[in-house]
């Protein structure tokens, strides 16, 4: 009797059937065994060699010091190995005199690290002073007849927190999710939930600030110049002082009727619902805006500290003053005809007279009237609108804008030009006596 030659797999299935194991389970075990046996020592050696090759090409990162994670900001020596920081230094075309450690310090906000020796508060104060000074002297010499309120608005449009935020983003600066010692020094580090230490601003803190915001008291231009900051805005009090004032106001408001309290609660709930969206709440957005603005100011302060006055002025001109701003859109007149009449009386001009220059479609749905404002034989302004009164108002507004936006030239000399070596003798700049009607 001849034996039948069966494959090894079939024999294992037969053995499994005798032992009570299902054929499917036996097949799976056999496949796993086959796959395990197919591996060899040569394959393992080849895998280890490729792993070593990758380590040679891409070495692992250097381990951080044991106490780095507990620090509020990265160590200064880590700035020398940051690719982001080196790229930012080259992108801004900074001088080699500015070390990477100083540039890394400009990226550490006071809310991330409260130590003034490691954050950018001091550099930001120097930079803020330089930026506001150069922009103020340039605006005053270029537009000597600007009203004080428009001057404040123009300065804020150039050097306020929002334009500085746009400048920082145009530089390609990324933000860290959470500040700490393990963060890359090339990232902007700030705490969105903690206000931090604000830099010192010029101006005085009003004791009536809480009542000023609640009752919308009017602030005169003289008080804005003397008491408020460089942009004519109210200098905010410390959080503790503001909380005490708010608590005192709440105690005075205890005599409200139930209907008034219910209406106020509904309004507060609506404000809370609107304040939170996909981009955070107003507090976190304000913290990010403030951190970016402090960073730009700190960069200017670092340039001044390491490279001098002229380098800082050139940087401000290239990155801040070069931005386009239509100052004519900042004007808002309430009584343009009365203000124009007062201006003509102050300057000893003949009283302004409105004259109809041309018209079309008076009896149609879309008439157009062109009105000109004349002082004697001199034409002061011209405006077109769908009604005679509106055209007269537009002509008066255009005449006032033409007066206030007078400029002696595109690049006038400023007082800081006298600090240069070999500067020409100073010629006093023309500065107008100011606006006609104070707003």
Curated annotation (Swiss-Prot):
InterPro entries: dsRBD_dom, Ribosomal_mL44_DSRM_fung, RNase_III_dom, RNase_III_sf
UniProt keywords, alphabetically: Mitochondrion, Ribonucleoprotein, Ribosomal protein, RNA-binding
Family matches, as Pfam families: dsrm
Entry's localization field: Mitochondrion
Role: Component of the mitochondrial ribosome (mitoribosome), a dedicated translation machinery responsible for the synthesis of mitochondrial genome-encoded proteins, including at least some of the essential transmembrane subunits of the mitochondrial respiratory chain. The mitoribosomes are attached to the mitochondrial inner membrane and translation products are cotranslationally integrated into the membrane.
Gene Ontology MF term list: double-stranded RNA binding; ribonuclease III activity; structural constituent of ribosome
Signal peptide residues on this chain, from the entry's feature table: none
Biological source species: Neurospora crassa (strain ATCC 24698 / 74-OR23-1A / CBS 708.71 / DSM 1257 / FGSC 987)
An example Gene Ontology CC term for this record: ribonucleoprotein complex
UniProt-recorded name of the protein: Large ribosomal subunit protein mL44
Sequence similarity: Belongs to the ribonuclease III family. Mitochondrion-specific ribosomal protein mL44 subfamily.
Residue spans of biased composition, Acidic residues class: 258-274
Family annotation (PANTHER family): LARGE RIBOSOMAL SUBUNIT PROTEIN ML44, RIBONUCLEASE III
Biased composition (Basic and acidic residues): 247-257
GO BP field: RNA processing
Highest taxon above the source species: Eukaryota
């Amino acid at each position: 009797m001849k034996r039948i030659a069966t494959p090894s797999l079939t024999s294992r299935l037969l053995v499994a059937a005798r032992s009570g194991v299902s054929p499917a389970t036996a097949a799976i075990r056999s496949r796993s065994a086959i796959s395990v046996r197919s591996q060899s020592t040569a394959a393992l050696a080849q895998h280890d060699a490729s792993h070593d090759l990758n380590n040679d090409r891409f070495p692992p990162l250097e381990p951080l010091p044991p106490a780095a994670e507990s620090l509020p900001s990265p160590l200064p020596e880590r700035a020398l190995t940051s690719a982001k920081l080196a790229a930012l230094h080259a992108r801004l075309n900074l001088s080699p005199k500015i070390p990477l450690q100083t540039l890394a310090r400009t990226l550490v906000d006071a809310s991330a690290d409260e130590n003034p020796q490691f954050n950018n508060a001091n550099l930001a104060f120097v930079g803020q002073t330089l930026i506001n000074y150069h922009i103020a002297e340039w605006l005053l010499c270029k537009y000597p007849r600007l009203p004080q309120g428009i001057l404040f608005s123009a300065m804020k449009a150039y050097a306020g927190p929002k334009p500085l935020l746009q400048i920082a983003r145009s530089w390609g600066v990324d933000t860290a999710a959470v500040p700490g010692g393990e963060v890359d020094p090339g990232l902007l580090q700030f705490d969105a939930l903690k206000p931090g230490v604000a830099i010192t601003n010029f101006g005085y803190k009003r004791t009536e600030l809480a009542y000023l915001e609640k009752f919308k008291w009017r602030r005169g231009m003289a008080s804005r110049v003397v008491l408020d900051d460089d942009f004519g805005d109210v200098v905010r009090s410390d959080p503790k002082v503001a909380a005490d004032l708010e608590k005192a106001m709440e105690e005075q408001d205890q005599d409200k009727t139930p209907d008034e309290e219910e209406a106020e609660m509904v309004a507060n709930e609506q404000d809370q619902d609107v304040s939170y969206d996909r981009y955070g709440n107003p507090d976190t957005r304000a913290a990010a805006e403030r951190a970016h603005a402090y960073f730009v100011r700190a960069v200017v302060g670092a340039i001044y500290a390491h490279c001098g006055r002229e380098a800082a002025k050139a940087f401000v001109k290239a990155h801040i003053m070069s931005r386009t701003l239509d100052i004519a859109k900042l004007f808002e007149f309430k009584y343009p005809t009365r203000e124009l009449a007062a201006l003509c009386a102050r300057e000893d001009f003949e009283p302004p007279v409105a004259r109809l220059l041309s018209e079309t479609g008076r009896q149609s749905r879309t008439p157009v009237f062109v009105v000109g404002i004349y002082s004697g034989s001199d034409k002061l302004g011209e405006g077109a609108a769908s009604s005679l009164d509106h055209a007269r108002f537009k002509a008066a507004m255009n005449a006032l804008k033409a007066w206030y936006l007078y400029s002696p030239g595109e690049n006038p000399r400023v007082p800081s030009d006298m600090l240069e070596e070999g500067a020409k003798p100073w010629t006093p700049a023309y500065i107008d006596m100011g606006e006609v009607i104070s707003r």
